[in-house]
Amino acid sequence: MITKIRLQNWKSFKDSTIYIDSLGILIGTNASGKSNVLDAFAFLRAVGDGKSLLDAIQTVRGGEDWIIRRGENTFCIEAEIETEEGNFILDLRVIKKDSGFSYGLCEIHRLGSITEENVPDEFTDSTRNITWKTYNIPSSMDFWSSLYATLRSI
């Protein structure tokens, strides 16, 4: 289950954190960002479904023209995910260059486990245009299945 989501330069959000319980209700005036929060979940789900970075961006209302806050060239979605193996942080950063979205970096680590001494396992998925860095992550398929199931259940 996702227990917290932080949006940086995502659509209309400069830097906002939303805490999530088992029951969540979004309330706000018109144009306050409710749909933009839902778009963030749709984007995470698309990444969890295995879509390429560009395809995941295209699932969001407004596509690449509206996904990053005006005047910025990068956005970040950070989700705290609770699994049977513990709590983890998924930190997804995307950089836009003049030629389009060229780079995604997804870091996954156990909550509170990153130190300067940690060296991540790193691999690049060139078909999806995302580099993955993992820190102290269980290598079991159960963990990865649980993580992707959480993202797909959004």
Functional labels for PLM-detected ranges:
Residues 86-154:
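Electropositive, glycine-dotted interaction segments
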Residues 39-102:
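Conserved P-loop NTP-binding catalytic core
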Residues 8, 80-82, 109:
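A generic structural motif
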Residues 26-28:
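Hydrophobic anchor at the beta1->P-loop junction of P-loop NTPases
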Residues 34:
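Conserved lysine of the Walker
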Residues 15-21:
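Phosphate-binding P-loop
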Residues 1-13:
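N-terminal pre-Walker A segment at the start of P-loop NTPase domains
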